[in-house]
Amino acid sequence: MVAWRAAGLNYVRYSQIAAQVVRQCTKGGANVKKPQATLKTTAWENGKMVSKSQ
């Protein structure tokens, strides 16, 4: 018999608890520095680069 069934849980409740634990383990704290997104664009005119922004 599987452990969650022996503990008196049904599969739905077991999966809810498991999902909650995974979310708690993977959640970053408020003080975790998040990487910044960068976007680079290049303007082209007649097949030649006109300007490049970073």
UniProtKB/Swiss-Prot annotation:
GO terms for molecular function: proton-transporting ATP synthase activity, rotational mechanism. Pfam families: ATP-synt_Eps. The keyword Mitochondrion applies. GO terms for biological process: proton motive force-driven mitochondrial ATP synthesis. Its main location: mitochondrion. Keywords: ATP synthesis, CF(1), Hydrogen ion transport, Ion transport, Membrane, Mitochondrion, Mitochondrion inner membrane, Transport. PANTHER family: ATP SYNTHASE EPSILON CHAIN, MITOCHONDRIAL, ATP SYNTHASE SUBUNIT EPSILON, MITOCHONDRIAL. Belongs to the eukaryotic ATPase epsilon family. Mitochondrial membrane ATP synthase (F(1)F(0) ATP synthase or Complex V) produces ATP from ADP in the presence of a proton gradient across the membrane which is generated by electron transport complexes of the respiratory chain. F-type ATPases consist of two structural domains, F(1) - containing the extramembraneous catalytic core, and F(0) - containing the membrane proton channel, linked together by a central stalk and a peripheral stalk. During catalysis, ATP synthesis in the catalytic domain of F(1) is coupled via a rotary mechanism of the central stalk subunits to proton translocation. This is Putative ATP synthase subunit epsilon, mitochondrial. It comes from Caenorhabditis elegans.
